[in-house]
Amino acid sequence: IGAMSAHGAVATGIATLTSDHTVLDVWYPEPELGAASSSGHAVLSGDEVPAELASLTGPDEDRGVERVAVRVEISDLTEPPADAYDAYLRLHLISHRLIRPHFANMDGLFGKLTNVVWTNFGPCAVPGFESVRARLRARGPVTVYGVDKFPRMVDYVVPSGVRIADADRVRLGAHLAEGTTVMHEGFVNFNAGTLGASMVEGRISAGVVVGADSDVGGGASIMGTLSGGGKETISIGERCLLGANSGVGISLGDDCVVEAGLYVTAGTKVDVRAGAWAEREPVKAGQLSGMDNLLFRRNSVSGAVEAVPWKREGVELNADLHAND
């Protein structure tokens, strides 16, 4: 991504604020990378508000919120997010594919966001929501999509060339490369995603990136770093396959396979049947992290986890399933 050499970002959008100025969400239709002299946000008024956004501003008394136009600048994306306006812009930059996961500093981002009731009428504050629900019911049925700090990506960004079978399964801040298909059981967290055409039928946890032409099989799991004290960032290389209900707590290089039902954590003891490792004692899987051309399998007789050489042609995706025009 050529524009990723830029270290700043700017955007104009619509923020939803409660009466105490808590930020429930911010939508930036056209964020940009570019130099910014300073970081911060400014509320726009009058002629400062772009014509296409003017009709979106104003109070929503039923929800108890005010919608305002804002201009937000970030001078240095390598610095942690300063506030919710900043945090939402970083999430938009990733989902708009202007930056890749890990390009921007996301330290402390979770704490900058507030818990929100996401409804078909827009974001609402959690405190007092039942009164809000009662007022909204006069407009029609009230659907609550979730109570969370992160909204669904597709309510803010719909990237070109992707298929998402269930919108609830992709958070704002996910990076879906052109040609990516996320099926009903797939899930992609924020600051994570795919770097090329991929099939996602399992879970891509926060911080995880998956290389081009890889397949995350049904129910497969890739360990993230949000909970459990984990610091290791997991990546999956190109042309890899995670079999159904498999999982990894190590990175895979290119052209690797984990057989269905096998979970390989960093501490899993592995009998290596490849190259210079072949005659050694079992090693911890963490020592194999990032290596290319390995098939991880469980010996059905001995029960031992083995790593054996895997063909260099790797995994081939069905092109028809990824022509997402």
Give short role names for the model-derived ranges:
Residues I1-P159, Q287-D325:
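Terminal amphipathic alpha-helical/low-complexity segments used for targeting or macromolecular assembly
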Residues M106-F110, M183, A197-M199:
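Short, surface-exposed recognition loops or helix-turn segments adjacent to catalytic cores
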Residues R133-G196:
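Glycine-rich adenosyl-nucleotide cofactor-binding module
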Residues S205, V209-A212, V216-D325:
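Glycine-rich hexapeptide-repeat left-handed beta-helix
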